[in-house]
Amino acid sequence: MGMPSMPELLIILLIVVLLFGAKKIPELAKGLGSGIKNFKKAMKEDEEEVATENKKEIEEKTTASTTKTTADQDTTKA
């Protein structure tokens, strides 16, 4: 099953107009657009949060690795 063809889309549009009325369609489209916008915003915030957490983990591992290397060098010098 692929995309609906033009006659099928026209039938769907006609049914929507009959169910909701022509005046309600812009309101429905506005609500749908607002929902999509909020979803994209939440996805972006989540991606930024994950990136921040990953950066912190890398910094912690680097710090731990540097500390261990420094400690190992101190024990070999002694």
Swiss-Prot record:
Location of this chain's protein in the cell: Cell inner membrane
GO molecular function, one term: protein transmembrane transporter activity
Keywords: Cell inner membrane, Cell membrane, Membrane, Protein transport, Translocation, Transmembrane, Transmembrane helix, Transport
Membrane disposition: Single-pass membrane protein
Stretches that traverse the bilayer: 1-21
UniProt keyword annotation of Electron transport present: no
Superkingdom in the source lineage: Bacteria
Function: Part of the twin-arginine translocation (Tat) system that transports large folded proteins containing a characteristic twin-arginine motif in their signal peptide across membranes. TatA could form the protein-conducting channel of the Tat system.
Protein name: Sec-independent protein translocase protein TatA
Species the sequence originates in: Nitratiruptor sp. (strain SB155-2)
Gene for this chain: tatA
